Amino acid sequence: MIRFHLLSAGDAIYSLSGLLRGSSALRVGTATLGRTAVEHLSRAMFLGESGINYRQRIQRTATLMEKGINEYRPSMPDHAIANSLVQQWTHFMARNRLEFKGLKAEKVSQYSVLVEKYFPKIGYVELSRPTHGNAIWVTLTVISEQQGGGASRVYALRNLAYCLDCLVTACDTVVQLWSLDIAAVERQANDDGPEPMTWNSVLQLRDSMLEIAESFEPRDYADFVDNPHPYGTSS
């Protein structure tokens, strides 16, 4: 399950980076993909957290499965498949209940709580504003774009930098959890991937992206006028 969440997060971040290659960054698209990536990474951290044993990881996985069925309505065509998967986990936990006896019941916190726990930075808030259609964010961003402020490009860079930082944190956790050999992982990744990369190059990219993102001040890309108007004039 940890691996599944990392793969999903990587897919979202790769798609996010693709939006930056165009002539105009898509401000809502990058935020939505970024938020998806960070939420997946928070679940990977929840399962791979240091200080818990394998029984607790299994219990947390089962809890995630049980919680996940809430998003599959009985009227949905894939509900039966999802429910069958959950039932398999329920039966597994029931058959092995003695092994898990005495463990404190696990609860899965909301995404925002998990993200704040494992990635305590304001980046998630920035991702959530456009995802939820925050009126203030939309107004300031559109005005900035109309005035040539480049808000979408700056927000997209900040989104990617934050996601890369979260990805590195999650990968570090997994490396320690599974005692992985980074060199072996690099070789496997380069065999499977289109472009050769090293872990050090990923860290350097993360650091450079964070440096660029942190170099911008709000006044460089956001328009804080007294009376924001969608057409850039006062009514």
Spans of model-derived segments:
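A cross-kingdom marker of C-terminal helix-rich interaction/assembly modules
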Residues: 1-40, 44-235
